[in-house]
UniProtKB/Swiss-Prot annotation:
Stretches the record annotates as Disordered: 364-397
Annotated glycan sites: N170, N196, N228, N283, N295, N316
Boundaries of every Ig-like domain copy: 29-134, 148-234, 237-327
Source organism: Mus musculus (Mouse)
GO BP of this protein: excitatory synapse assembly; homophilic cell adhesion via plasma membrane adhesion molecules; intracellular calcium ion homeostasis; long-term synaptic potentiation; modulation of chemical synaptic transmission; negative regulation of cytokine production; positive regulation of cytosolic calcium ion concentration; positive regulation of fibroblast growth factor receptor signaling pathway
Topology with respect to the bilayer: Single-pass type I membrane protein
Entry's Gene Ontology molecular function annotations: cell adhesion molecule binding; type 1 fibroblast growth factor receptor binding
Localization: Cell membrane
InterPro entries the record matches: Ig-like_dom, Ig-like_dom_sf, Ig-like_fold, Ig_I-set, Ig_sub, Ig_sub2
Keyword list, A-Z: Cell adhesion, Cell membrane, Disulfide bond, Glycoprotein, Immunoglobulin domain, Membrane, Neurogenesis, Repeat, Signal, Synapse, Transmembrane, Transmembrane helix
Gene behind the chain: Nptn
Listed name of the protein: Neuroplastin
Function comment: Probable homophilic and heterophilic cell adhesion molecule involved in long term potentiation at hippocampal excitatory synapses through activation of p38MAPK. May also regulate neurite outgrowth by activating the FGFR1 signaling pathway. May play a role in synaptic plasticity. Also acts as a chaperone for ATP2B1; stabilizes ATP2B1 and increases its ATPase activity. Promotes localization of XKR8 at the cell membrane.
Annotated signal peptide: 1-28
Extracellular-side segments: 29-338
Length: 397
C-alpha cells in the first residue's frame, strides 16, 4: 500500500468506528428529561399545571407521584380523576412522551412534592427491581397558602338610565404585607388605579355597554402570590361596526360582519329575509360559512348567485341581559354590470346619430328651390315710385 493511500484508509476506518458508536434509528436510548416540572406557590381556590417532557428509545412511560409536606419518602401515585375529580392527567406518546398534571380548586392539603417519573426499562414495573434504578425522577414543590378574604360589591347591570356606578373591594384579612393594589377590566390594568390601599373603589360616571365586562381588584403582597376578586358588570349587546350594504358581482364572494359590545359575550345568529320574514340561514347550498368569536361574527357567501343571494341579511346578538339586531342589504350585479356605462354611452351616441339623420332628411326638401318660381322678388326702382306719387296729373283737354 502506498503512503498516499494510508491517510484515506485511516480516515475511512475512523468514520466507520465512530458511526458504529452512534445510536441508529432503532438503537436503544435511555430516558431523559427535556422539560421538568417547576415549583410554584398558589392560593386556595386556584389551580396549577405541571409539565413533563421526556425522550428515549423506546418512548419512556411517564407517571406522576405525590408526597405530603415533611413526608418526602412516602410517595403515592396520582391517577386521573383523583381527589374528587380535581386531578387531571393528560399524557401523549410519540417520538417523545409529554404529560401534564393539573389540579383545580386547591386546598391547603394539596401542598407537597410532586414527582414526574419516566422509564423505558423493560423491567421498570417489576416489583423486585429498585425503582430508583429503573426510573428517572424530576420533582417540584407546590405550596398552597390561604387566600386572603376580599369583600366585594354586587354585580352591576347597565341600563339606559346612565346613572353612575361604583365598584368596591375591601381586603379584610391577610397574613401577608400588602405592596399595592389596582383594578383591571377584562385582564387589562385600568390607568390611574394603582395605589397602596386595601379598600378600593372604581367609579363609572356614564356607564354604557362598552364599559361592561369582568372587573378585578388585584392585591400584590410582599412574599405571597397576588390575590384578586371579580365583579361582573353586565349589559345587553350593542352592535357596532357593521356594513349597511354590500355590492358584489355574480360569481364573487361576499363577506358581512357584525361587532358588538356588552357582557356576557353574546350568541350570534344570521338570518335572511324571505317573503317579508327573517329566517335563520340553513346553508342547504353549502355556500354559507359563519364564524363567531365572542363579540364578533362573520358571514361569508361563496360563488354568489344573482337569483338566490341578493336580499336583506340580519345578524342577531343575544345574551342573558338582552338582544340586538342589525341588517345589511346585499346586492348582486350581473356579469355585464361593468359594461353598462359603456353600453349607455354607445346607446346615447346611436340615438343622437339617428336624430341628426332624420332631421336632415326632413329638412332637405324644404330648402331646395323650385325651377318654375323666380329665384327672388322683382327689383323695383323705389325712387321713381316715390316721385310718381308726388306728380300732378295735367288735364290735356
Amino acid at each position: 500500500m502506498s503512503g498516499s493511500s494510508l491517510p484515506g484508509a485511516l480516515a475511512l476506518s475512523l468514520l466507520l468506528v465512530s458511526g458504529s458508536l452512534l445510536p441508529g434509528p432503532g438503537a436503544a436510548q435511555n430516558a431523559g428529561f427535556v422539560k421538568s416540572p417547576m415549583s410554584e406557590t398558589k392560593l386556595t381556590g386556584d389551580a396549577f399545571e405541571l409539565y413533563c417532557d421526556v425522550v428515549g428509545s423506546p418512548t419512556p412511560e411517564i407517571q406522576w407521584w405525590y408526597a405530603e409536606v415533611n413526608r418526602a419518602e412516602s410517595f403515592r401515585q396520582l391517577w386521573d380523576g383523583a381527589r374528587k375529580r380535581r386531578v387531571t392527567v393528560n399524557t401523549a406518546y410519540g417520538s417523545n412522551g409529554v404529560s401534564v398534571l393539573r389540579i383545580t380548586r386547591l386546598t391547603l392539603e394539596d401542598s407537597g412534592t410532586y414527582e414526574c417519573r419516566a422509564s423505558n426499562d423493560p423491567k421498570r414495573n417489576d416489583l423486585r427491581q429498585n425503582p430508583s434504578i429503573t426510573w428517572i425522577r424530576a420533582q417540584a414543590t407546590i405550596s398552597v397558602l390561604q387566600k386572603p378574604r376580599i369583600v366585594t360589591s354586587e354585580e352591576v347591570i347597565i341600563r339606559e338610565s346612565l346613572l353612575p356606578v361604583t365598584l368596591q373591594c375591601n381586603l379584610t384579612s391577610s397574613s401577608h404585607t400588602l405592596m399595592y393594589s389596582y383594578w383591571t377590566r377584562n385582564g387589562v390594568e385600568l390607568t390611574a388605579t394603582r395605589k397602596n390601599a386595601s379598600n378600593m373603589e372604581y367609579r363609572i360616571n356614564k356607564p354604557r355597554a362598552e364599559d361592561s365586562g369582568e372587573y378585578h381588584c388585584v392585591y400584590h403582597f410582599v412574599s405571597a402570590p397576588k390575590a384578586n376578586a371579580t365583579i361582573e358588570v353586565k349589559a345587553a349587546p350593542d352592535i357596532t361596526g357593521h356594513k349597511r350594504s354590500e355590492n358584489k358581482n355574480e360569481g364573487q364572494d361576499a363577506m358581512m360582519y357584525c361587532k358588538s359590545v356588552g357582557y356576557p359575550h353574546p350568541e350570534w345568529i344570521w338570518r335572511k329575509k324571505e317573503n317579508g320574514v327573517f329566517e335563520e340561514i340553513s346553508n342547504s347550498s353549502g355556500r354559507f360559512f359563519i364564524t363567531n368569536k365572542e363579540n364578533y361574527t362573520e358571514l361569508s357567501i361563496v360563488n354568489l348567485q344573482i337569483t338566490e343571494d341578493p336580499g336583506e341579511y340580519e345578524c342577531n346578538a343575544t345574551n342573558s341581559i338582552g338582544s340586538a339586531s342589525v341588517s345589511t342589504v346585499l346586492r348582486v350585479r350581473s356579469h355585464l354590470a361593468p359594461l353598462w356605462p359603456f353600453l349607455g354611452i354607445l346607446a346615447e351616441i346611436i340615438i343622437l346619430v339617428v336624430i341628426i339623420v332624420v332631421y336632415e332628411k326632413r329638412k332637405r326638401p324644404d330648402e331646395v328651390p323650385d325651377d318654375d318660381e323666380p329665384a327672388g322678388p322683382m327689383k323695383t326702382n323705389s325712387t321713381n315710385n316715390h316721385k310718381d306719387k308726388n306728380l300732378r296729373q295735367r288735364n290735356t283737354n
